[in-house]
Amino acid sequence: MEDYKQRIKNKLNVVPMEPGCYLMKDRNDQVIYVGKAKKLRNRLRSYFTGAHDAKTTRLVGEIRRFEFIVTSSETESLLLELNLIKQYQPRYNILLKDDKSYPFIKITKEKYPRLLVTRTVKQGTGKYFGPYPNAYSAQETKKLLDRIYPYRKCDKMPDKLCLYYHIGQCLGPCVYDVDLSKYAQMTKEITDFLNGEDKTILKSLEERMLTASESLDFERAKEYRDLIQHIQNLTNKQKIMSSDKTIRDVFGYSVDKGWMCIQVFFIRQGNMIKRDTTMIPLQQTEEEEFYTFIGQFYSLNQHILPKEVHVPRNLDKEMIQSVVDTKIVQPARGPKKDMVDLAAHNAKVSLNNKFELISRDESRTIKAIEELGTQMGIQTPIRIEAFDNSNIQGVDPVSAMVTFVDGKPDKKNYRKYKIKTVKGPDDYKSMREVVRRRYSRVLNEGLPLPDLIIVDGGKGHMNGVIDVLQNELGLDIPVAGLQKNDKHQTSELLYGASAEIVPLKKNSQAFYLLHRIQDEVHRFAITFHRQTRQKTGLKSILDDIDGIGSKRKTLLLRSFGSIKKMKEATLEDFKNIGIPENVAKNLHEQLHK
């Protein structure tokens, strides 16, 4: 089976049984189809099993991968689907040309306004609410409001009272001088309802129902009860679509197994038009990692600052405000908090998928190590040991080793190391120390030697390890280096005297195994480093300076990167990032003692 088919098969197994939308992509990573589903896993599986009509068969033949977005209801899925189709215009979807395809409810701009359902938006002619997922939904909402509020119904003002007046669904402004303030109050209540605020209208109906019941008018009371139930069924709060047109980005995140996934929903004109997903290994606390991420997210000119940024309430608003120059909102309740929660839920789903896919791929690892050995020109590496270092500015440096046997993690043979002989952040010397300690003990205790050693790094790391093995310990074990790209993803395998790139296909089983090994050793090292920091406390020269607490220390390290850079900074540099003048003076003096 071709690799992309196997990847799709693996991913199908970890898709949740929840409502949502999915995006099918071709070999060029272009979205070719957008769909929705009540249960994502069932719908997605249906594409890759059984017979299909000619159009679907052509579609499936072009699919190379898929993505999905979890929503909270089927209605949300439908609304999101409409937006995604408009955004990507996939060729296998029936394209919707413009906003005229969507039904809206309109309150006309007249002395005595009317309620209309329309697909045409004309600015300056009234207030528009929507879009609604279909005409039926919009018409049902209008009918409900017509029954509750005696709003004008006629296109043109007639010269006599019509049927609507006689059945209590119009105040008759065509004949009577209707109090404009009463009409304005109705308009306000209707507007609130169409904006998603249904408490006022429900309270009013409950009061009417109670009054009718006390008057023994049970038929009227039943009518009000039915209206209340109808509203509760109709007003399934929409998180994906909002009548609030504020331009905003919504952030949510999830953390697991040393990794953090951050999801960003881009909300424009009340619609979620795009999603960004980022996976990063945790090197700090989750809060500190988020502050660094969001600062870079907008500072790298990849994303335009919106009017509002919505973030979880556990984060420090002032810290985010120091790096993001726009309004920061931490919703406590309602649809806005629901949206933040939905972003976090999608982040959790993405993390779970990552780990589930890794776990399911273990059964195919023998093929991976055979392929790896062939491409490197060595014997099949049954036992692989991989090393990675972890520290922050040289503080509490540690290293970790993971062992893979037959391409599977052998966790009982994982090892942790605290760096003992190296002062400061020196990755090369730290790696030499750990390798020396590890294989001196292996030789002394007669433990099994690995068939391949992998270091997280490049030629410098490899040469240091080879020197220790050959010239100090008399061992001849293949040593390879794994490098990452700027997105912190496994990029290439280096091997040989000149650290040449091993020609592995990025979609091969061997490359995927290397990616997993690098992720695992990094996770293990980061987790150990975090545990070490929690025990000893992150100690630095900044801890002894009055006025510098944990927040300001994080701000300084993020702004300058190192103590060395802080020593080169001027008093004005400190003040420019928000450090008070008296604290800045004290900091400047202490750094130059």
Swiss-Prot record:
PROSITE patterns: GIY_YIG (PS50164), UVR (PS50151), UVRC (PS50165). It comes from the Bacteria. Residues 17-94 form the GIY-YIG domain. InterPro entries: GIY-YIG_endonuc, GIY-YIG_endonuc_sf, GIY-YIG_UvrC_Cho, RuvA_2-like, UVR_dom, UVR_dom_sf, UvrABC_protein_C, UvrC. Disulfide bonds: none annotated. One of its GO terms (cellular component) is excinuclease repair complex. Its main location: cytoplasm. Residues 199-234 form the UVR domain. It is found in: Cytoplasm. One of its GO terms (molecular function) is DNA binding. Keywords: Cytoplasm, DNA damage, DNA excision, DNA repair, Excision nuclease, SOS response. One of its GO terms (biological process) is nucleotide-excision repair. Interacts with UvrB in an incision complex. The UvrABC repair system catalyzes the recognition and processing of DNA lesions. UvrC both incises the 5' and 3' sides of the lesion. The N-terminal half is responsible for the 3' incision and the C-terminal half is responsible for the 5' incision. HAMAP family: UvrC. Belongs to the UvrC family. This is UvrABC system protein C. The gene is uvrC.
